[in-house]
Amino acid sequence: IAQGTSELTGGITNLNEANKAQSNYKFVASKGASTSANQAELNVDGTMHYQGHKHGDNYVLDNTFSNFNLKVEGSKLELYADVHYRKYVDNNTAGEWQDAKQIKVSEWTLKQPLALKAGDVAFASNGQGKFGSQDVISALGDFYKDDVHTGAITGKVKVSRECPPVPSTSAKPSSE
């Protein structure tokens, strides 16, 4: 963010700290769950705080993303987060604070559908993703609208055990 700062906490780090214009973030999930072999939800503790366009004592752009949830189902991967941000007014005015819960930040299509099995399972997007909602664009002051701001994603999860098979829903006829 122009004329700004960034701060990361918890399970979030920038693997390219020397060149923040080309940031490459690493998210380490604190917990995860799955209900089937092609579905998972991973939760990341930590925050991403960005400030930019400082005027006086305040920043025109000031937002904190937190409570990250990465949801995968089949070939669809979506990143959700809470965001606390200043509503954009203009380049010289710090707007009122706004809050939005679990907005879709970004979305990607995976190269292959998720297939969980016991052990390490890797996944990768089929190229860059895109912003997931108007909410995230608003939180960024409507400055960053195009998809180049959501890079490709890769990841690995450690699955502790096989997912049980989906229970059968067919019922046997009763003898009554």
Each PLM stretch: what is its role?
Residues 162-176:
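Ser/Thr/Gly/Pro-rich low-complexity, disordered linker/stalk segments of secreted
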Residues 1-32, 41-43, 49-166:
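Extracytosolic secretory-pathway proteins
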